[in-house]
């Protein structure tokens, strides 16, 4: 019996467990034993949908050890799809071809072999296969019965996966769960403040002008627990922080100028009371090649205004 035929046969047994509830620890372990011995390939995974079926069985079983074992097997298959399994270190070529390739290279020593760095497969490269593993370990069981928390974790995961993945990326699924759990712990419920905090983090992770934040979270520079408690100011990009600092300084300066005694003048007419009993002060609030800002204070009604 070929590996494909054996996998198809085992798929039927997995379907029986999922559809009829005929699971037992012994039966599940036996199935997993047989599946782990099959030399799985992308073709088999694609034709049999074995990843989806075993993942469904994982969610059905009540034994944690069996569920964990199924999860590990699914991860091994995911590695096959991603081209990271030990049998495919050369990019997916079979061992025999690899041997022939090495022989050819040995016969041509003048050509220096340059090993290309690992490139993460694009999400759309094999959508029909990758979809089988999208929920292999996500979401965790403790979120499956809470619709709000589950949706929050899914949205956070989507935001973490928004765009290219940097080198050294941690597991986005685990990060999404850790962020959600910390948010829930801080707000102690799925209330309005919890929802607002989730939305704020999703917005900042998806902000194309703040790519450094998402990269820092994915690579662990900013820990998931820390990210969950960061303020809007802390999450903001450098450009936004500079703008906020500028506006704050201008507001402070304007307030200070308004309470300081300026130069008396009747050149300015108050737009509020119509009188010309005013004082003014001029300061360079912008770059040196820009006009100075004039701060005017009406001594009659207390109205303040400025112009350049």
From Swiss-Prot:
Pfam families: Med26, TFIIS_M, Zn_ribbon_TFIIS
Region span, Disordered: 82-126
Gene Ontology annotations for the cellular component aspect, listed alphabetically: nucleus
Example GO molecular function: DNA binding
Cellular compartment(s): Nucleus
Entry-linked SUPFAM superfamilies: Conserved domain common to transcription factors TFIIS, elongin A, CRSP70, Elongation factor TFIIS domain 2, Zinc beta-ribbon
Zinc finger (TFIIS-type): 266-306
Gene Ontology biological process terms, A to Z: regulation of transcription by RNA polymerase II; transcription elongation by RNA polymerase II
Occurrences of domain TFIIS N-terminal (ranges): 5-84
Binding site for Zn(2+): 270, 273, 298, 301
Bias (Basic and acidic residues) ranges: 102-125
This protein's UniProt keywords: DNA-binding, Metal-binding, Nucleus, Transcription, Transcription regulation, Zinc, Zinc-finger
Keyword Metal-binding: yes
InterPro entries: TF_IIS-typ (IPR035100), TFIIS/CRSP70_N_sub (IPR003617), TFIIS/LEDGF_dom_sf (IPR035441), TFIIS_cen_dom (IPR003618), TFIIS_cen_dom_sf (IPR036575), TFIIS_N (IPR017923), TFSII (IPR006289), Znf_TFIIS (IPR001222)
Function: Necessary for efficient RNA polymerase II transcription elongation past template-encoded arresting sites. The arresting sites in DNA have the property of trapping a certain fraction of elongating RNA polymerases that pass through, resulting in locked ternary complexes. Cleavage of the nascent transcript by S-II allows the resumption of elongation from the new 3'-terminus.
Family: Belongs to the TFS-II family.
Designated name of the protein: Putative transcription elongation factor S-II
Upper lineage: Eukaryota, Metazoa, Ecdysozoa, Nematoda, Chromadorea
């Amino acid at each position: 019996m070929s590996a494909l035929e054996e996998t198809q046969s085992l798929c039927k047994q997995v379907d029986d467990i999922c559809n009829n509830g005929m699971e037992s620890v012994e039966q599940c372990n036996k199935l997993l034993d047989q599946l782990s011995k099959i030399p799985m390939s992308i073709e088999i995974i694609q034709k049999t949908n074995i990843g989806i079926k075993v993942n469904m069985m994982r969610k059905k079983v009540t034994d944690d050890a069996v569920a964990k074992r199924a999860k590990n097997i699914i991860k091994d298959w995911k590695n096959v799809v991603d081209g990271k399994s030990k049998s495919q270190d050369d990019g997916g070529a079979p061992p025999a071809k690899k041997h022939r390739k090495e022989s050819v290279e040995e016969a041509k020593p003048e050509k220096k072999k340059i090993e290309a760095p690992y490139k993460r497969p694009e999400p759309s490269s094999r959508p029909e296969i990758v979809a089988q593993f999208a929920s292999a370990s996500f979401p965790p069981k403790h979120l499956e019965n809470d619709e709000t928390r589950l949706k929050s974790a899914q949205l956070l995961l989507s935001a973490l996966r928004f765009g290219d993945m940097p080198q050294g990326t941690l597991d986005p699924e685990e990060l999404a769960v850790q962020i959600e759990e910390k948010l829930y712990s801080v707000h102690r419920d799925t209330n309005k403040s919890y929802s607002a905090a989730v939305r704020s983090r999703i917005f900042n992770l998806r902000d194309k002008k703040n790519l450094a934040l998402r990269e820092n979270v994915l690579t662990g520079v900013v820990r998931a627990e820390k990210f969950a408690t960061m303020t809007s100011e802390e999450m903001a990009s450098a450009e936004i922080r500079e703008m906020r600092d500028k506006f704050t300084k201008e507001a402070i300066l304007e307030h200070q100028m308004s309470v300081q005694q300026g130069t008396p003048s009747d050149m300015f007419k108050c737009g509020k009371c119509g009188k010309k009993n005013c004082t003014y002060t001029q300061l360079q609030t912008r770059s040196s090649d820009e006009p100075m800002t004039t701060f005017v204070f009406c001594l009659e009604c207390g109205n303040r205004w400025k112009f350049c």
